[in-house]
């Protein structure tokens, strides 16, 4: 019986040893999993810190780019406003200069008309004075590049304005018969169309 007991004890001891080994293995695996968790936690904390630093750097970089873009936009806006103001002043200056040139050319004609109106003389003298003023005025227009639109020949709707139509076999179709009011142009720009009578 004692042998049986010693075998039993041995078996019991073996079972106890085995269970203790299992407990140790479980304890070791728990410890190793805790260590792994701790290591993983440290790694993930490091990763988060690195990621956080990267995001902060990227955020700072984007903020700087945005500030630079805002600055460029403000400068461009100011430059555009200056350009608009400058061109408006230049345009006004050009218009004023053009008006001055025209007026300076016309003033002598006005002076002569006033002199003619204030003088006493015969109708022939007055007529002669008016003809001289007309000639002076045409010279002034010529200096400004303004010329009379020729009205002979065919009717041209780009240059003429037909205010009357007549039936006359002595003229060809759409031929200008008479100029009722002269037209003028400067270069290719028509300042005033000629008012004409046209044959049908």
Swiss-Prot record:
Keywords, ordered alphabetically: Chaperone, Cytoplasm, Stress response
Predominant cellular place of this UniProt entry's protein: cytoplasm
Residue stretches of biased makeup (Basic and acidic residues): 1-10
GO CC term, one of those recorded: cytoplasm
GO terms of biological process kind: protein folding
Region annotation Disordered: where it falls in the sequence: 1-57
Entry superkingdom: Bacteria
InterPro entries: GrpE, GrpE_coiled_coil, GrpE_head
Cellular compartment(s): Cytoplasm
Biased composition (Acidic residues): 11-29
Pfam families: GrpE
A single GO molecular function term of this UniProt record: protein homodimerization activity
Function: Participates actively in the response to hyperosmotic and heat shock by preventing the aggregation of stress-denatured proteins, in association with DnaK and GrpE. It is the nucleotide exchange factor for DnaK and may function as a thermosensor. Unfolded proteins bind initially to DnaJ; upon interaction with the DnaJ-bound protein, DnaK hydrolyzes its bound ATP, resulting in the formation of a stable complex. GrpE releases ADP from DnaK; ATP binding to DnaK triggers the release of the substrate protein, thus completing the reaction cycle.
Subunit structure: Homodimer.
Protein family: Belongs to the GrpE family.
This protein's name: Protein GrpE
Organism: Clostridium acetobutylicum (strain ATCC 824 / DSM 792 / JCM 1419 / IAM 19013 / LMG 5710 / NBRC 13948 / NRRL B-527 / VKM B-1787 / 2291 / W)
Lineage, highest ranks first: Bacteria, Bacillati, Bacillota, Clostridia, Eubacteriales
Gene: grpE
């Amino acid at each position: 019986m004692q042998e049986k007991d010693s075998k039993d004890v041995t078996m019991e001891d073996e079972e106890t040893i085995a269970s203790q080994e299992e407990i140790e293995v479980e304890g070791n695996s728990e410890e190793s999993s805790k260590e792994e968790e701790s290591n993983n936690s440290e790694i993930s904390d490091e990763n988060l810190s690195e990621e956080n630093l990267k995001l902060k750097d990227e955020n700072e970089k984007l903020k700087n780019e945005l500030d630079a873009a805002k600055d460029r936009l403000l400068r461009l806006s100011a430059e555009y406003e200056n350009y608009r103001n400058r061109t408006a002043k230049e345009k006004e200056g050009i218009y004023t200069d053009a008006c001055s040139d025209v007026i300076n050319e016309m003033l002598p004609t006005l002076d002569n008309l006033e002199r003619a109106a204030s003088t006493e003389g015969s109708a022939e003298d007055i007529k002669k004075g008016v003809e001289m003023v007309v000639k002076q005025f045409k010279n002034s227009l010529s200096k400004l590049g303004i010329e009379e639109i020729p009205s002979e020949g065919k009717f041209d709707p780009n240059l003429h304005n037909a205010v009357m139509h007549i039936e006359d076999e002595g003229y060809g179709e759409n031929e200008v018969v008479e100029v009722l009011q002269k037209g003028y142009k400067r270069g290719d720009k028509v300042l005033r169309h000629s008012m004409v009578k046209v044959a049908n």
